[in-house]
Amino acid sequence: CQNTCPANVEIPLYVDSVYHGEYQNAYSIIQRENPLPTICGRICTHICETMCNRRVKVDEPVSIRALKRYACDKIVEAGEEFPVPAVAPANGKRIAVVGSGPSGLSCAYYLCLNGYDVTVYESKKELGGALYYGIPAYRLPKELLARELDVYRKMGIKFVTEKALGKDFTIESLRADGFDAIFLGLGAQLGKIPPMGNSSVSGVMSALEFLREVAAKEAPDITG
């Protein structure tokens, strides 16, 4: 299972921690290779389960993703905070990350762990990119995304919202502000509409556009 996981998370270790009720430890184990444990506990495609030894040798695989979610949910239910990893001493280097989606957040997380001073720029009002604007709340509650982002803030990562590349700042202006390097995690935000008749009429929109409007509480009236 671990070798099949794209992040190579130490699945046997965190499953054992869940078994013993050590939920904080389980979160920390996941967090070493995956900086978004709570989010992935709800939306990852759990391909690790396809190669679970129990599935191969007995009958059904261990519900690995569900156990990840369970560990995170138990921390929340207990009124506890998610564990914050220790970061390396500051190395004096400043990094700008443009985009607060999964790519930008992962980049910011690991840079901060290694002592870099990281600032994340987001063009929209809310942080998370597709995590906030592309995934419905019934799959990924906004409050859980906010809790995960609190870990980043406690690590020392800074966030700047409603500032867009090419409009409010440029690569050159970031360099002039003293950033030593810039990471662009802009996402793939254009939706597709199938080639069919009347697809260009008013009111027809892509699924991504509709989800963004729902998340921003600007969804069109679809009653009828």
Can you name each region flagged by the protein language model?
Residues 174, 179-180, 224:
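Local beta-strand N-terminus motif with an aromatic residue
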Residues 71-89, 147-167, 191-224:
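Glycine-rich dinucleotide-binding loop and its adjacent helix/turn
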Residues 1, 5, 40-44, 48, ...:
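Short cysteine clusters
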